[in-house]
Amino acid sequence: MESSEPEPTEDASMDAFLEKFQSQPYRGGFREDQWEEEFDKIPLFMKKAPSEIDPEEFPDLACLQSMIFDDDRYPEEQAKTYKDEGNDYFKEKDYKKAVLSYSEGLKKKCADPDLNAVLYTNRAAAQYYLGNVRSSLNDVLAAKKLKPGHLKAIIRGALCHLELKHFAEAVNWCDEGLQIDAKEKKLLEIRAKADKLKRMEERDLRKAKLKEKKEQHQNEALLQAIKARNIRLVSESAGEDEDSASNGPAEILLDGLSSENPYGARLSIDDQGRLSWPVLFLYPEYAQSDFISAFHEDTRFIDHLMAMFSEAPSWDSEHKYHPENLEVYFEDEDRAELYQVSPDSTLLQVLQHPRCCVKALTPAFLVCVGSSPFCRNYLQGKKVHR
């Protein structure tokens, strides 16, 4: 009977081989301290491909890439390869590279309309996440042209219109998609949101139109009131005086009646048809000013002066600005002349003066202490009508 045990010569050979293997390290293998880095250089086990593939550093990967993107392959195969590459970038949220890959796939101009529709739709999604909503919508339209019933393209188009605040269009796209799949959850959600926003937009538009109509009626009433009082107006940018009585205020300052001045006030009319003006008081001695947001036309100047100077303002260090000491003037800019205003005059009486002109719908008056040296010097050389 033959023995199954190896002959002594075979055992000796195996022992010699193992001793040699242990004493001489395996050349070309991974180093113990760098095995992870070396492992990551093998294409099959790479966690992430390098952005730039150097054939000398990554020869295996460069070889695979040349095989994958071989121009000798059919356009459909190349386009699909770029589509898959774009999908990988998309999953990594690298949307810029995804756009580039999908674009390369479209450049192949393959004859498969479904594949091209997918490339357009996928690129639209990447563009959307990059914030290029109009580019995304253009791609969706191209995909829809190739494949009208492409549901993903319709969903993306609805999202684009929603983002662009085209709420009615978003609803229409959703309705089109729901004809294909009436239970599509995403379309139902988009439609509900778009319809709600569309209704809000329509409501706001109605409110804006009502407000505009109300303001138009108010402006017409203001214009009629100004014209009836023969008050002269001049626009802020006008080079020459524009008389409201002769030229017609509607042609002069219709837009100005609807706008506030820099202080946030505007000309108004009450239920009795009486006007209240924003008025500016200027104190040239101290380069100071006061603004009255609503100076009623039937109120006297002295009434406002008493209220403003019941206590000395912080800039009146000499405490000389008392109502009984103050003189008020308006300027005739055309003639460079000043007209003194009686403190007992109402605003309307002054505005109806033949030489008083209201600039930018805000009457302005100069105020100074009549007995002060500054006032005498300031008025010196000027023609003053008292």
UniProtKB/Swiss-Prot annotation:
Keywords: Acetylation, Antiviral defense, Cytoplasm, Immunity, Innate immunity, Nucleus, Phosphoprotein, Repeat, TPR repeat
UniProt modified residues of type Phosphoserine: S51, S244
An annotated GO BP: defense response to virus
Localization of this protein: Nucleus; Nucleus, Nucleoplasm; Cytoplasm
SMART domains recorded: TPR (SM00028)
One MF term in the entry's GO annotations: Hsp90 protein binding
Family: Belongs to the TTC4 family.
The protein's assembly and partners: Interacts (via TPR repeats) with HSP90AB1. Interacts with HSPA8, CDC6 and TBK1. Interacts with isoform 1 and isoform 3 of MSL1.
Function statement: May act as a co-chaperone for HSP90AB1.
UniProt name for this protein: Tetratricopeptide repeat protein 4
Provenance organism: Mus musculus
Gene this chain is encoded by: Ttc4
